[in-house]
Amino acid sequence: SGSGKSTLLNMLGCLDRPSSGKLYLGDDDVAQMNDDQLSYIRASRIGIVFQAYNLIQQLTVVENIEVPLIYQGRISKSDKQRCVELAKMVGLGQRLDHRPTQLSGGQQQRVAIARSLVNNPYFILADEPTGNLDSKTTYEILALFQQLNDAGKTIILVTHEDDVSRHAKRVIRLRDGLIQVDQRHEQERFDEVPMAVALAAVSAL
């Protein structure tokens, strides 16, 4: 608490603007954008995964994955197929028509991860994504993030847990709003099937 995590998350997620300086996402200085422009950036370039999943209870797995597309006013036949393929990619191929109340916590977080990928974002911002999960399910979700990273997707994951951070390639520690540690190290690996080919196929839809 008080480390500056929330401020950093809000900056990276384009929810807040810096009081001075510049903040670039690609070639764009988002610090100079208006609210409508920032809303578009959030919807099209940033995937967000929350600790509490934030799924819509009345919608199915596939319909929840479709939500960012609906907010953008587009949902074509190919978009719908992409959502189905994303659900399958995260291991929910047998639960496409299930609603959140019919899913475990880990399964709900898999829906949230698939939803974060639907617009093929520049990066995924994950805020304590394993905070509500047991240890076994935590490792399953971390393995999924690791596979996505292996497939070329940047993951920015916030955690208080050393057991979680040791699975990252790079660890940045904050204290009182300042970076105390910024180090790269050999990450602990999971014995999972790589999904690079699957993610590439979904992105091509």
Go through each PLM region and give its residues.
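Conserved beta-strand-loop-alpha-helix hinge in the C-terminal portion
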Residues: 178-204
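ABC family nucleotide-binding domain
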Residues: 1-167, 174
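Generic hydrophobic, helix-prone segments enriched in Leu/Val/Ile
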Residues: 115, 127, 199-205
